[in-house]
Amino acid sequence: MNKLTIIFFTILLLTYIIVEKEALKIEDLPEPESYKKAKQLAVKDANGDKRAEGIALDFLRQNRRNCTVNCDLVLTCPLLTPECCPKKNDGCLKLDTVKNG
């Protein structure tokens, strides 16, 4: 019974990894100019503090990912994901998070 459980969860984990790797994510699309400007502002506002810069860039990345399915999440969603907000174009509709969301 123990071996079967381990085999089952191993197969489940491998399936999850393969599906996640093959999924089309917002990070796979080219970055729009408005998102690049937001990243530059985040780096500028950090004033050379690498930790603050990392936190700001992670925050932007997470908001960009979450804005694909919910344009009302933050007011800057149209700047972070212009391909999805306010109207979803073909590039956005191909994303797996939008299809499943």
Swiss-Prot record:
Signal peptide as annotated in the record: 1-23
GO MF: potassium channel regulator activity; toxin activity
The organism's taxonomic lineage, starting at the top: Eukaryota, Metazoa, Ecdysozoa, Arthropoda, Myriapoda
Protein name per the record: Kappa-scoloptoxin(10)-Ssd1a
Record has Protease as a keyword: no
Organism: Scolopendra dehaani
Keyword field: Disulfide bond, Ion channel impairing toxin, Potassium channel impairing toxin, Secreted, Signal, Toxin, Voltage-gated potassium channel impairing toxin
Function: Voltage-gated potassium channel inhibitor.
GO terms for cellular component: extracellular region
Chief localization: secreted
Compartments (UniProt record): Secreted
Family: Belongs to the scoloptoxin-10 family.
Tissues in which the protein is found: Expressed by the venom gland.
Post-translational modification: Contains 3 disulfide bonds.
